[in-house]
């Protein structure tokens, strides 16, 4: 089966203490007015990793020097002809967020991320956060060990 041509990404951003996760409130469909991870499209000729850092910078003001992103997983939606690549990382410092388009907010880890009225992704967000929490996700200046 052929892989989809359209590739999107989403980025799970934890604060430096790894007790909060960053969300944006979507202003357009799909999932208008629901909370989701930041992310966007991988442009032609761009690597997936570069696209993740670019989208993070554009949507939040968070730069490569403030976070190390790790590839977490990908989901392929064959019937919708796109692949979603999921990255996760933990900030190495407190940051001042810069909203590009969608409002941004930090949420505690004990939120009900399965609430379909509040969160995008048909309950995928809860699963993604649980997977991300299984890994140490050391900040930029720490080594994996």
Predicted regions span which residues?
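Active-site-adjacent beta-strand/loop module that shapes the phosphate/pyrophosphate-binding cleft
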Residues: 73-112, 121-136
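Short connector loops at helix/strand junctions that flank enzyme active sites
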Residues: 6, 32, 37, 64, ...
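A short beta-turn/loop motif at secondary-structure boundaries
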Residues: 3, 29, 75-79
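A short coil-to-beta-strand element that immediately follows conserved catalytic motifs
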Residues: 63-72
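Residue-level signal for short segments within beta-strands and strand-turn junctions
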Residues: 13-15, 25, 90-91
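Conserved N-terminal beta-strand and adjoining loop/helix that marks the start
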Residues: 1-21, 41
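C-terminal regulatory/oligomerization modules of transcriptional regulators
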Residues: 134-145
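Conserved Nudix-box catalytic region and its N-terminal flanking loop in Nudix hydrolases
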Residues: 20-58, 145
């Amino acid at each position: 089966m052929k892989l989809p041509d359209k590739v999107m990404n989403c980025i799970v951003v934890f604060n430096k203490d790894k007790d909060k996760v960053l969300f944006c409130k979507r202003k357009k469909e799909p999932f208008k007015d629901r909370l989701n991870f930041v992310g966007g499209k991988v442009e032609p000729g761009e690597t997936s990793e570069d696209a993740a850092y670019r989208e993070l910078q554009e949507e939040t003001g968070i730069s490569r020097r403030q976070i190390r992103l790790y590839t977490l997983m990908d989901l392929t939606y064959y019937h919708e002809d796109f692949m979603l690549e999921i990255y996760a990382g933990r900030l190495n410092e407190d940051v001042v967020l810069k909203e590009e388009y969608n409002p941004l907010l930090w949420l505690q880890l004990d939120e009900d991320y399965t609430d379909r009225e509040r969160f995008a992704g048909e309950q995928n967000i809860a699963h993604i956060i649980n997977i991300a929490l299984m890994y140490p996700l050391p900040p930029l200046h720490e080594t994996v060990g």
